[in-house]
Amino acid sequence: MDVKNKRVVVTGAASGIGKALCEAFHEADVQSIVAVDMNLDGAQETADSVDGIAVQANVG
């Protein structure tokens, strides 16, 4: 899957698979990452590590 220069939104980004996806997308040179989680502090930590932005949301 070619994601270079795409914008991505990752839910569950504070930990686990969501955090790993953010890291993988960052390595794949996406244009921007939105890290979404109910845990805003965790989402912000992930976003900071991948030059993204954090959003608090319950998508369940």
Features from the language model and the residues they span:
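Conserved Rossmann-like nucleotide-binding pocket used by diverse enzymes
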Residues: 9, 34, 53-55
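Rossmann-fold cofactor-recognition segment
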Residues: 47-60
